């Protein structure tokens, strides 16, 4: 058996037969073409062509292992695979560009971009959203390994809005990582390049409130006209809140469908994947998963240093190198925390008339040296948000099951991550005694073993805590 074009066609066919998500494979596997076979007879190298850098990045991150496994099972001998950017078209309305008009910072993988495509025709004159922040652009976003795929996806969507392969674009990650920045950056880029398009940027909570108000006032036709007929680009932040109301979720589902059917671009941001949004209907989840999903996580130390340098220059603050490293090292929770610490140092220095040095900064930010990287209240908030209850309910004495289980899980997580005493944990929950806490910990361990859904809830919460606390 030779590694040739027929062999690669066979591999793609076998992969599709094993995979239920044919939409994913149609989008990402189909465009991969056989280019050549190089290397030695003992270890041939299969060179496969991909259309562009974004495609290359996605395949390497998400499909490479599956491709290797399928080839290994079929070929049965040593081999290598190389994914080479060849510029072949994905489809008739997306072409590659080797000379983008903006050079992205970060990895070289981001430098090949998709060309613009004029594929959205509005029926009315432009009426762009006034809520876009003009300072949040691609040029002011510091790209790191944690965000390069999300950044590249947003940038390519902004250059080519409405493309089937990237609609909707769904960005997810913990709070304060830059998701909102990317939404605004995409909106600003589209507004600059496609001045005839009408852009709507809105939070899911505001969409929900307006929808509920329209239902009460019997003004749904007006509401639908605003979001479906009078807009060409829809940018929605904090999508997880859509699941709070059945009627709102229904309206949101049809709004997103209307946009996609009309080849109008939808970009969504959330703190979790669609499958992890409690209360989200299956059809809504499926619709959100049918486009492109990109995650954004906490930046590593190197990227935090780069972000801090950029912010310091923006705020005209001169920081010694040891100060930059110190602030970046202790600011582990989010980019917002990083910027907040910089502003705190700047303000203290100006008010006291003192030069910024390592000793001063350590004094200003001393609480970071002794403070846990996540607090009791923050864990409570994570659990409350996850189960759609209030922190106040967790601290109450109610024995209702929808409250008791989240309360017990919160106690378990606080014990695991903060190692607080049973007495201290009890005090945090409205003065519960240590026996109650001890029973709660035992109860959660039993639930983890007996209930897969609860085990998954705890796993998700632990991962979110890890994302906040890791360096």
Curated annotation (Swiss-Prot):
PROSITE patterns for this protein: DNAA
PANTHER family found in the cross-reference section: CHROMOSOMAL REPLICATION INITIATOR PROTEIN DNAA
Protein known as: Chromosomal replication initiator protein DnaA
Region Domain III, AAA+ region, residue ranges: 131-349
Stretches the record annotates as Domain IV, binds dsDNA: 350-471
One of the GO BP terms on file: DNA replication initiation
Pfam families: Bac_DnaA, Bac_DnaA_C
Subunit structure, as described in the record: Oligomerizes as a right-handed, spiral filament on DNA at oriC.
Residue ranges, annotated region (Domain I, interacts with DnaA modulators): 1-77
Alphabetic keyword roster: ATP-binding, Cytoplasm, DNA replication, DNA-binding, Lipid-binding, Nucleotide-binding
Keyword set includes rRNA-binding: no
Region of interest: Domain II: 77-130
Annotated compartments: Cytoplasm
Gene3D superfamilies recorded: 1.10.1750.10, 1.10.8.60, 3.30.300.180, P-loop containing nucleotide triphosphate hydrolases
GO molecular function per UniProt: ATP binding; ATP hydrolysis activity; DNA replication origin binding; lipid binding
Organism ancestry: Bacteria, Pseudomonadati, Bdellovibrionota, Bdellovibrionia, Bdellovibrionales
Role, per record: Plays an essential role in the initiation and regulation of chromosomal replication. ATP-DnaA binds to the origin of replication (oriC) to initiate formation of the DNA replication initiation complex once per cell cycle. Binds the DnaA box (a 9 base pair repeat at the origin) and separates the double-stranded (ds)DNA. Forms a right-handed helical filament on oriC DNA; dsDNA binds to the exterior of the filament while single-stranded (ss)DNA is stabiized in the filament's interior.
UniProt-listed CDD domains: AAA, Bac_DnaA_C
Comment, domains: Domain I is involved in oligomerization and binding regulators, domain II is flexibile and of varying length in different bacteria, domain III forms the AAA+ region, while domain IV binds dsDNA.
Primary localization class, coarse: cytoplasm
């Amino acid at each position: 058996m030779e590694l040739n074009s027929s062999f690669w066609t066979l591999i793609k066919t076998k992969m599709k037969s094993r995979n239920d998500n044919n939409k994913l494979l149609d989008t990402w596997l189909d465009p991969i073409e056989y280019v050549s076979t190089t290397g030695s007879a003992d270890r041939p190298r299969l060179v496969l062509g991909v259309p562009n850098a974004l495609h290359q990045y996605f395949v390497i991150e998400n499909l490479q292992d599956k491709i290797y496994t399928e080839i290994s099972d079929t070929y049965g001998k040593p081999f290598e695979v190389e994914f080479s950017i060849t510029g072949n078209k994905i489809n008739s309305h997306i072409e590659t560009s080797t000379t983008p008009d903006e050079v992205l910072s970060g990895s070289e993988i981001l430098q090949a971009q998709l060309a613009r495509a004029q594929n959205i025709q509005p029926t009315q004159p432009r009426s762009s959203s006034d809520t876009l922040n003009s300072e949040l652009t691609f040029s002011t976003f510091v790209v790191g390994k944690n965000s390069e795929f999300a950044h590249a996806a947003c940038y390519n969507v902004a250059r080519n809005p409405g493309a089937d392969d990237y609609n909707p674009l769904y960005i997810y990650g913990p709070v304060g990582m830059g998701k909102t920045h990317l939404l605004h950056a995409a909106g600003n880029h589209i507004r600059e390049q496609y001045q005839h398009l009408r852009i709507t940027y809105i939070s899911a909570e505001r969409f929900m409130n307006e929808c509920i108000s329209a239902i009460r006032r019997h003004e749904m036709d007006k509401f639908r006209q605003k979001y479906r007929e009078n807009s060409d680009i829809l940018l929605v932040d904090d999508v997880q809140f859509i699941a709070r109301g059945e009627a709102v979720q229904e309206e949101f589902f049809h709004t997103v469908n209307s946009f996609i059917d009309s080849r109008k671009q939808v970009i969504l941001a959330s703190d979790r994947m669609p499958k992890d949004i409690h209360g989200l209907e299956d059809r809504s989840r499926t619709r959100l998963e049918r486009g492109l999903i990109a995650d954004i996580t906490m930046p590593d130390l190197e990227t935090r240093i780069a972000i801090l340098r950029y912010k310091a220059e923006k705020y005209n603050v001169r920081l010694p190198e040891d100060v930059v490293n110190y602030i970046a090292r202790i600011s582990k929770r989010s980019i917002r925390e990083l910027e907040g610490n910089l502003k705190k140092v700047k303000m203290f220095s100006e008010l006291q008339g003192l030069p910024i040095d390592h000793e001063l900064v350590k004094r200003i930010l001393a609480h970071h040296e002794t403070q846990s990287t996540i607090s009791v209240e923050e864990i409570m908030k994570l659990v409350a948000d996850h189960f759609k209850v209030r922190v106040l309910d967790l601290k109450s004495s109610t024995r209702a099951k929808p409250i008791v289980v989240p309360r017990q899980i919160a106690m378990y997580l606080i014990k695991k991550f903060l190692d607080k005493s049973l007495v201290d944990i009890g005090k945090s929950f409205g003065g519960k005694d240590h026996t109650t806490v001890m029973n709660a910990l035992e109860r959660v361990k039993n639930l983890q073993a007996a209930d897969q859904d609860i085990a998954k809830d705890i796993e998700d919460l632990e991962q979110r805590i890890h994302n906040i606390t890791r360096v």
